[in-house]
């Protein structure tokens, strides 16, 4: 195989990978991120109340995310959860940037460069920033978040109804356990 053929093959691979990555950033069709978003008010700690189970959070309890404005202008992201089977915390740090105007809650989040995924706030307590519903790039990713580890059932029901209307598989939503952590083994 000639050097030119190898270079062309590599270039095609990189272009194909880039197209695939770009396809993972937008919101699902028919799902719009909220507008009038205030990133500074969104910063801080959020607890996962419900989620559609996914490979990177499977088995984790006490899941939370912390967002902060970094000096370089990116949004710092720290996701954390407790692995009760191994009795240890797992966390990962990343960064996010707005996909467009900062008043539209559509961001791309990267934990491993150059890979990024979409993060779209699709419902929000605009008055107090007390709860939010976040979608990923497909309907297979959905979270209900709150500033505290509990959220009233009426708000959860309202958010689940909105998710159902947007054709998310709400039957796949699971509650996130935020009970006290105790790893003592019985003797």
Name the predicted role of every residue range:
Residues 24-187:
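A beta-rich soluble binding module of mature secreted/lumenal proteins
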